[in-house]
Every structure is written in C-alpha cells, then in structure tokens.
Regions:
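The feature captures the beta-strand-to-loop junction immediately N-terminal to the Walker
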Residues: 49-51
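Helix-to-loop junction immediately C-terminal to a conserved catalytic motif
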Residues: 64
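Conserved ABC transporter NBD signature motif
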Residues: 72-84, 124
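Short coil-to-helix segment of the ABC ATPase nucleotide-binding domain corresponding to the Q-loop/switch region
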Residues: 101-108
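Conserved ABC ATPase "signature" region
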Residues: 112, 119-137, 189
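Conserved signature/switch motifs of ABC ATPase nucleotide-binding domains
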Residues: 140-143, 161
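Catalytic Walker B motif of ABC-type/P-loop ATPase nucleotide-binding domains
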Residues: 166-169
Length: 264
C-alpha cells in the first residue's frame, strides 16, 4: 500500500471536524510551527507524531484556543477558533486532579467549571468511571490512585459533557511502559463507546498505530506536515495486533518518515 505524502490539507468530502490552514506560531527563538495545514474528519482518531520540539503540543494549544497563532487559522466545524470553545475537551500529560476531591467529584468538576448542575451529570460520571475500569474507586482521592488511574479520571472528566472534540496532549507520557500500553487499550475502549473526534499527540509510534485512524507525521522544527499515513487495521485492536504484520509495516512507515529527517 502506498502512503499518502502531504505538505498540504487532507481533503475530505464533508465539513471537517478540525481544519488547520497555514498555521504558524513564532517565538523569540524562532518558529515552532510554520504553514501547517491538515484536516480531521468527524469521529476520527488522528495522531500527531514527530521529532521532539516540532510543535505538536503548540499545535494542539492553538486548535484549542489556548494559544493564538502568529499566522494562519484553525477551524472547528467551520467556526474559526479565536478563544477556548466549550465543546472541546482537553487532556494534558499531567492529570491535574484536585487533591481534596474524590474520583467522582473530580469528574463532576467539569460540570461546575461550565456552569452546569453537577447533579444532572452524576449518572454519566458513574457510567464513565465504570467504562474506564474505575468502578469501586469513586470515593478515592488522587493520592490513593496510581498514575494510570489518575489519568483515566482526567479522561472521564474531559468526556463528562460529551465534547464533540477531544484534544489529548501526550496523556500517557509520564507512565511506565506497561501501564502506558494498558492505558492505550483502555482509551480505545472508552473512545469506541463514545466516538468523539480525537486529536492525539504522542512520541510513541506503537501508541500512534494502535490507537489511530490516521497518523500525521510532522517535520522537525518548524513543524509542517511531512506525511499522512492511514491506519487500516481492523478494530477493536488488542495485544495480538501489536505483532500483526500490517501493524509492523505501518509502524515502520511512521519511523522511516521521522528518521528520514535526521539525514536530510
């Protein structure tokens, strides 16, 4: 199978969930991202990968409205992003849980932040906690949970109001390799039940191939789109998928696109 190479937009037939056009972000030290363009389809799980410092996290923050671009525009369902949008959930590398709140209280905090009545979302919070394999830990506090469990609480919190778009910035980066692998399968289960559109950032090629419908490989700083690789593996994916010949081929394609930059 030939992989689509692109420095432009991923074309779609319907309005994209996310559309980025000529996005550039410059700092005093230079451009982190330059003329970046791509699209994410509705209900698609798309992952950004690339060399360290290529602007993956900066891109996510511009799309979320947390950081303004120097040039270019980001759109969510056709609406230009000029401030944080309520229908977008965000998960960071650190779970950022409130230490004085229990698991369910941390999940319900999202409703409070958005001015909603937490009581109306209690059943959804319990359903998400169960889906994330945290049943029985509803009343536990963050210090009583492992790192992986804390991150699952953060994911449940981000999903509480059922955002149509979920942005995830290296959410498993601080976890050990075994916990990280388990979290990948847990996230796949949660996403399969909700089918939110997801834009995910990771340094792990294995994680990217396991989770994604599409992988966007970025160039070294300043970040641009180097390649777009569709992941045509059937779902659900499990531990056997990791040794599947097609999985290995896709992972090699991603790795080759990243490593090619080291010799260019």
């Amino acid at each position: 199978m030939a992989f689509q190479q692109s420095t432009g937009i991923i074309m779609t037939t319907n309005m994209a969930a996310v559309k980025v056009e000529g996005l550039t972000k410059s700092f005093e030290t230079g451009a982190a991202v330059e003329d970046l363009s791509f699209e994410v389809r509705e209900n698609e799980f798309v992952t950004l990968v690339g060399p360290s410092g290529c602007g993956k996290s900066t891109t996510l923050r511009m799309i979320s409205g947390l950081v303004p671009p120097t040039q270019g525009k980001a759109y969510i369902r056709g609406k230009e992003v000029d401030r944080p949008i309520g229908d977008v959930g965000m998960v960071f590398q650190s779970p950022v849980l409130l230490p004085w709140r229990s698991t369910i209280s941390n999940v319900l905090f999202m409703a409070e932040m958005r001015g909603e009545n937490p009581g109306e979302y209690r059943q959804r919070a319990l359903d998400l906690i169960k889906l994330a394999s945290l049943e029985g830990f509803e009343k536990r506090y963050p210090h009583e949970l492992s790192g992986g469990m804390q991150q699952r609480v953060a994911i449940c919190r981000a999903l509480l109001l059922n955002p149509s778009l979920l942005l995830m910035d290296e959410p498993f980066g601080a976890l050990d390799i075994m916990t990280r692998e388990k979290m990948g399968f847990e996230l796949q289960k949660i996403w399969s039940a909700s089918r939110n559109t997801v834009l995910f950032v990771t340094h792990s090629i294995t994680e990217a191939v396991l989770l994604s419908d599409t992988i966007i490989v970025m160039t070294a700083r300043p970040g641009k789109v180097k390649a777009v690789i569709p992941v045509d593996l059937p779902r659900p994916r499990d531990t056997k998928t990791l040794s599947d010949a097609r999985f290995v081929q896709l992972a090699a394609a991603v790795r080759d696109n990243i490593e090619a930059q080291w010799v260019e």
